[in-house]
């Protein structure tokens, strides 16, 4: 009898590294997770230690195999999904990072972004990279590192330094420096990549003064990139055969591979993606045009709206405000009151993402009266996640001309039934919650498994996409629009807060 085979998905996130083992029926066999330190050197700055990312991720791989009691030669392939945009520059010779990883949430490059806008590059960048000018993306982060680490730009020109997003860093480490690659989805988040020619964009490299020598090779999201024996007893070589940025992996894991299908992931931030097939739709409404995975991991396009603060705003209630002891408590307290008593929380702690793109917005609570208590504020914070999702969906429908019939959801916060019901109420659309919650890992596993023939095609995977619960709108249109108008008013007042503070 042949040994049973499995796929391992490595899910390197913003706050933790995880490893997930799946069998052929897409059942989760075991999960291992390790958190790592968030570094905040200055207000609005966010960093990670790349060596800690590697240490936590590699140890979860060893751990998850031990937990599942399977040997490395039972692993058919490894797929990688990762926090996107986070930027690492390291020495080719030693593998030592020259600076901490600059995280996607970090706003330190706002000034560089202002220069790009003043130089009239907005339309060029939107047309060619699909992105807006914002500190969120990797390009300005790489420039910042090269500007601030002495001699680094010259070293990069000499081929001594390498740049990578987290996927690239992990594969480089897993292959002992033999493989320096990324995939189309991650490359499309750098602001350095032309999403039409599918190559690094010479003009952007010139504008940001980033040497081409340091960039990884860009490949499909589903193919064999190299082999690793990390965690392997006796040096079994396991193919690494799937890479996708976390949101594109979730889109694929939800099997949103046809034009017009959309999903929203509720994690640290909120990310809604709608597959637009082989057509790159240029957004007129503050969304991003990004690369997604087609049915066999080939290039498709998607519209994306990124909301920076979703689960992070619940953590704020817990860690800074001390209003709850556990994120799961938020649902209980939110349902202790009938409504928010007129309160709106705008969680613009690091500015606002889509469709506003205002790095100078700041968090605010509006509508406070004497009768407002902690439960109202907890409820309003949860509701802010759903309102921000509606902001994005409105923009998406305007750009694509496609009316969404159902939204597939995933991520930690979807366990919150209050939030999911309110989401359906405020959108006026069905919300579908899948049985398998680990859709990001699932997407990475699918991409890796398809590349090595573990699964033959997507038809084989369709029956595994079971919807566990469907939420339907329970409020009238007038009420929905009235509440949403209040939210829009609150957002308007939170915008451009920081820039007047000379």
Swiss-Prot record:
What are its GO biological-process terms?
DNA damage response; glycerol catabolic process; glycerol metabolic process; glycerol-3-phosphate metabolic process
Encoding gene (name): glpK
Q: What is the lineage of its organism?
A: Bacteria, Pseudomonadati, Pseudomonadota, Gammaproteobacteria, Enterobacterales
GO terms of molecular function: ATP binding; glycerol kinase activity; identical protein binding; metal ion binding; zinc ion binding
Q: What is this protein called?
A: Glycerol kinase
| Activity profile over pH | Optimum pH is 9.8.
The superkingdom of the source organism is Bacteria
Q: Where does sn-glycerol 3-phosphate bind?
A: 14, 84-85, 136, 246
Q: Which residues bind ATP?
A: 14-16, 268, 311, 315, 412
């Amino acid at each position: 009898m042949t040994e049973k085979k499995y796929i391992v998905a490595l899910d390197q996130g913003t706050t933790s590294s995880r490893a997930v083992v799946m069998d052929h029926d897409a059942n989760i066999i075991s999960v291992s997770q390790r958190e790592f330190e968030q570094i905040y050197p200055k207000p609005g700055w966010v960093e990670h230690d790349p060596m800690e990312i590697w240490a936590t991720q590699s140890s979860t791989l060893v751990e998850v195999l031990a937990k599942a009691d399977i040997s490395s030669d039972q692993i058919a392939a490894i797929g990688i999904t990762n926090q996107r945009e986070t930027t690492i520059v390291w020495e080719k010779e030693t593998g030592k990072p020259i600076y901490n990883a600059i995280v996607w949430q970090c706003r330190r490059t706002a000034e560089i972004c202002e220069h790009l806008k003043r130089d009239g590059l907005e339309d060029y960048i939107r047309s060619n990279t699909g992105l807006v000018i914002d500190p969120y993306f990797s390009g300005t982060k790489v420039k910042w590192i090269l500007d601030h680490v002495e001699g680094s730009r010259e070293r990069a020109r000499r081929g001594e330094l390498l740049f990578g997003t987290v996927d690239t860093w992990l594969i480089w480490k897993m292959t002992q420096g033999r493989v320096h690659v990324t995939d189309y989805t991650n490359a499309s988040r750098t602001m350095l990549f032309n999403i039409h020619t599918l190559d690094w964009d010479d003009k952007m490299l010139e504008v940001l003064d980033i040497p081409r020598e340091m960039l990884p090779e860009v490949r499909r999201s589903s193919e064999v990139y190299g082999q690793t024996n990390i965690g392997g007893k006796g040096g079994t070589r396991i193919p690494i055969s799937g890479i996708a940025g976390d949101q594109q992996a979730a889109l694929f894991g939800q099997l949103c591979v046809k034009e017009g299908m959309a999903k929203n992931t509720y994690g640290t931030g909120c990310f809604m993606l709608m597959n637009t097939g082989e057509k790159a739709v240029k957004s007129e409404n503050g969304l991003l045009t990004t690369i997604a995975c087609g049915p066999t991991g080939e290039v498709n396009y998607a519209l994306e709206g990124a909301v920076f603060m979703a689960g992070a705003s619940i953590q704020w209630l817990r860690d800074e405000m001390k209003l709850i002891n556990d994120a799961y408590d938020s649902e209980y307290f939110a349902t202790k009151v009938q409504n928010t008593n007129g309160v709106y929380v705008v969680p613009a702690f690091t500015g606002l993402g889509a469709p506003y793109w205002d790095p100078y917005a700041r968090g605010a609570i509006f509508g406070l009266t004497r009768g407002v208590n902690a439960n109202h504020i907890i409820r309003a914070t949860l509701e802010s996640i759903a309102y921000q999702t509606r902001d994005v969906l409105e923009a998406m429908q305007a750009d694509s001309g496609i009316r969404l019939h159902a939204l597939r959801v995933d991520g930690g916060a979807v366990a919150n039934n209050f939030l999911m019901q309110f989401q359906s109420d405020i959108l006026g659309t069905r919300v579908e919650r899948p049985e398998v919650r680990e859709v990001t890992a699932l997407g990475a596993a699918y991409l890796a498994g398809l590349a090595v023939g573990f699964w033959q095609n997507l038809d084989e995977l369709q029956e595994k996409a079971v919807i566990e619960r469907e939420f339907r709108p329970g409020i009238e249109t007038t009420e929905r629009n009235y509440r949403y108008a209040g939210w829009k008013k609150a957002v308007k007042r939170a915008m451009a807060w920081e820039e007047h503070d000379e």
